[in-house]
């Protein structure tokens, strides 16, 4: 319904409530709407009158009586608007019509229905000096606390000075408008008879208590007053045995009690709840959520204040009530999880409870935590609950550690990336080596459950899972090993084929040799599943390399590979031809001038060959030709031609700069001057050879087929081998190039690409 046109007709009027468009219920006189007060967002109910000349007196009487009657049990009136005939409103607390459609569910708890009847009797008791006249099924409402309240004061009149004729006339008019039958015209009995009919509507004859039947029949006939009817019911066994009636009276007065009195009331609630939880099921909507739970939360906060700090509190000054904290918290958690309703401040209560050191409190929170995730935001869980929650994994009590472990999956979706992939995994690494078998088993199960949300960066997830499952497969107990195989089975889609081939199969393989036949059987099945995944991937591989040799697709008989003697001879001959060809191409050429005699060649080779080696390679001490000739008497002839060698390029070695280790002499040192010897040594050719400086010989490894060039030629030269050379065609410069430095031999790289597990624990 559009109320804007109505309010615009009122000059300078601002309606202080927001009203919904659709009515929740409607009678012949009223339309009932849910609304909200603009000032503080308080939920309200707005009754809009359907004013007409026929019912105007009835509506105005209802508005007037709503202003002056402030009686418990009537709808609490906040404000009325009756200045305009088109906009007559009665604003009350938030109420809903009695759920007659759900009466069957409410009737399952007879204590709850009896409690509602007692609430109506209490309201009518306050109205003993008034005639209500409208008591019926349509006049019963339920407020936000689940209490039964009455609305509809169209016929309400004071008994003092009331004219029976005038009341009967108004009553007939009212029941004609609503289309119902007038129970009685007598103002003294109309409410009694209306109450009797209402009780019979609430309780079927088969459900009516035996000690109530007579009294209900009497009041239905108007034979007794409401006050007498109430007194008779209070004396029945049904009334006295109803625990909710007495508890409700105490609960209504809780706001005026001191902390000790509140604790007594809640202790009675504890006894009732622990004796029979069914008493608190199927109560009137709102009774548990908005009445019992908020009061329990308030008393728990007082007890928590005493438990957290030693500061004096009103409770603490009188007696120690900390032992009541656990049962009260258990009742609150159980009630909220059943009704799935959470009062204001419930989140703070839960977060503060996690800070308590009491193991029983923490255990309760862990049990109910999966059901409490709804009202808690992700930030509250990650910042206020998780730091205290995770400490349970290091608790000395195994039961608490296990329960904490089981609760992890319900909060992982609310954790930050750092908490999930760093902190949590570190704690799980510790529980995997716990002394308790169940904890070790559950650790693997939890890792399997949260594996899908672990970080996949840098192969982190694959390494973590492989490490965890490998460790559990080595567990001395069978249960953790089976849990590891279960985790591998659930995680098969998380591994790519390369990871399976390189890591996962090696993880499963030890299970094939397990002592337990169950483990061996499951490991075999799992191994085949992973192998099947590899085979499927292998079938999808397409060979598109056009440059591949045809031999790649042929089978090779390695048993007879290279054993054919004829083929081996052909191959050896080919290798020898290649070797000689390389020598021919890389050997230096020498020229012999015609004016050099053969004697001079002998003298040049045998007399001064060693002495003419330069120190360019850093190992041979150089001497001048002139000083060397002083101790030699070469035989020369005019016909001996002089040989000229081809210049040789010497490659610089990596260790040429290491000149201070005593192995290499400086060129400027005194050792460069050859010493004179009185007794020259004789060569094998009977020629005198002057003693040379210290000779250093280097060897360099080369492959047999490597091309030999002058720069990299490697030979081994000694004095005796030099004196035995008889070939006259080899130039002296080639002797100089034959002495090279010794090459380094590369060792095996011990730090190969070993596939290490990235534990990240």
From Swiss-Prot:
Listed Acidic residues bias regions: 747-761
Gene3D superfamilies: Leucine-rich Repeat Variant (1.25.10.10), Phosphorylase Kinase, domain 1 (3.30.200.20), Transferase(Phosphotransferase) domain 1 (1.10.510.10)
Record field: compositional bias (Polar residues): 680-692, 714-737
Annotated stretches, region: Disordered: 660-692, 714-761
Protein name: Cytoplasmic export protein 1
Any one GO biological process: tRNA export from nucleus
Compartment list: Cytoplasm
Other known facts: Present with 1360 molecules/cell in log phase SD medium.
One Gene Ontology MF term: tRNA binding
A cellular-component GO term for this protein: cytoplasm
Keywords assigned by UniProt, alphabetized: Cytoplasm, Phosphoprotein, Repeat
Self-association state and partner proteins as the record states: Associates with the nuclear pore complex (NPC). Interacts with GSP1, LOS1, MSN5, NUP116 and TEF2.
């Amino acid at each position: 319904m559009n109320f804007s046109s109505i309010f615009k007709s009122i000059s300078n009027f601002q309606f202080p409530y927001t009203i919904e468009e659709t009515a929740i219920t409607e009678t012949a006189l009223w339309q009932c709407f849910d609304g909200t007060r603009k000032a503080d967002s308080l939920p309200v109910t707005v009754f809009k009158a359907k004013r007409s000349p026929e019912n105007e007196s009835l509506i105005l009487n209802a508005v007037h009586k709503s202003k002056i009657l402030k009686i418990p049990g009537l709808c609490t009136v906040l404000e009325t608007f009756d200045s305009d005939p088109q906009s007559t409103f009665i604003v009350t607390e938030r109420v809903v019509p009695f759920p007659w459609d759900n009466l069957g569910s409410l009737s399952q708890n007879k204590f709850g229905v009896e409690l509602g009847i007692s609430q109506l009797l209490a309201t009518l008791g306050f109205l003993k000096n008034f005639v209500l006249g409208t008591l019926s099924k349509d006049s019963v409402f339920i407020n936000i606390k689940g209490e039964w309240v009455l609305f509809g004061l169209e016929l309400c009149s004071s008994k003092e000075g009331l004219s029976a004729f005038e009341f009967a006339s108004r009553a007939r008019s009212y029941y004609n408008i609503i289309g119902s039958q007038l129970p009685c015209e007598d103002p003294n009995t109309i409410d009694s008879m209306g109450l009797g009919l209402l009780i019979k509507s609430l309780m079927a004859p088969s459900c009516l208590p035996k000690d109530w039947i007579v009294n209900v029949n009497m009041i239905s006939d108007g034979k007794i007053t409401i006050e007498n009817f109430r007194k008779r019911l209070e004396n029945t066994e049904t009334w006295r045995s109803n625990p909710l009636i007495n508890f409700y009276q105490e609960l209504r007065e809780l706001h005026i009690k001191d902390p000790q009195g509140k604790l007594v009331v809640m202790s009675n609630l504890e006894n009732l709840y622990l004796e029979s939880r069914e008493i608190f099921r199927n109560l009137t909507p709102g009774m548990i959520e908005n009445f019992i739970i908020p009061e329990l939360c308030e008393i728990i906060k007082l007890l928590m204040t005493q438990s957290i700090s030693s500061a004096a509190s009103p409770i603490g000054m009188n007696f120690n009530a900390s032992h009541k904290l656990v049962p009260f918290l258990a009742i609150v958690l159980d009630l909220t999880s059943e009704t799935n309703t959470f009062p204001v401040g419930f989140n703070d209560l839960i977060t503060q409870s996690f800070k308590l050191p009491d193991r029983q409190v923490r255990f309760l929170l862990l049990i109910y935590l999966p059901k409490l995730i709804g009202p808690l935001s992700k930030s509250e869980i990650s910042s206020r609950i998780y730091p205290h929650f995770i400490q349970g994994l290091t608790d000395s009590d195994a039961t608490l550690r296990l329960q904490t472990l089981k609760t992890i999956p319900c909060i992982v979706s609310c954790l930050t990336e750092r908490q999930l992939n760093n902190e949590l995994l570190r704690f799980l690494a510790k529980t995997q080596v716990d002394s308790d078998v169940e904890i070790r088993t559950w650790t693997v199960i939890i890792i399997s459950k949260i594996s899908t949300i672990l970080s996949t960066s840098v192969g982190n997830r694959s390494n973590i899972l492989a490490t965890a499952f490998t460790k559990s497969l080595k567990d001395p107990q069978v249960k953790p090993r089976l849990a590891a195989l279960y985790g591998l089975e659930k995680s098969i889609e998380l591994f790519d084929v390369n990871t399976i081939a390189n890591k996962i199969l090696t993880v499963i393989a030890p299970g094939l040799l397990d002592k337990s036949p169950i483990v061996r059987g499951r490991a075999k099945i799992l191994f085949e599943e992973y192998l099947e995944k590899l085979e499927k991937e292998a079938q999808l591989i397409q060979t598109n390399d056009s440059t591949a040799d045809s031999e790649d697709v042929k089978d090779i008989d390695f048993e007879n590979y290279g054993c054919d003697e004829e083929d081996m001879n052909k191959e050896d001959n080919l290798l020898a031809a290649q070797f000689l060809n390389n020598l021919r191409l890389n050997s230096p050429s020498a020229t012999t001038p015609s004016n050099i005699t053969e004697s001079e060649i002998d003298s040049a080779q045998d007399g001064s060959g060693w002495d003419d080696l330069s120190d360019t390679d850093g190992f041979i001490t150089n001497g001048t030709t002139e000083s060397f000739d002083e101790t030699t008497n070469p035989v020369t002839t005019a016909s001996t031609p002089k040989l000229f060698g081809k210049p040789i390029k010497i490659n610089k070695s990596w260790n040429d700069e290491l000149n201070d280790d005593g192995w290499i002499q400086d060129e400027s040192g005194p050792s460069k001057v050859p010493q004179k010897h009185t007794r020259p040594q004789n060569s094998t050719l009977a020629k005198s050879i002057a003693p040379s400086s210290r000779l250093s010989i280097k060897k360099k490894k080369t492959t047999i087929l490597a091309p030999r060039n002058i720069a990299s030629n490697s030979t081994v030269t000694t004095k005796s081998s030099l004196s035995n050379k008889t070939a006259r065609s080899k130039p002296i410069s080639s002797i100089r190039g034959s002495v090279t430095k010794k090459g380094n031999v590369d060792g095996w790289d011990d730090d190969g690409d070993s596939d290490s597990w990235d534990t990240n624990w």
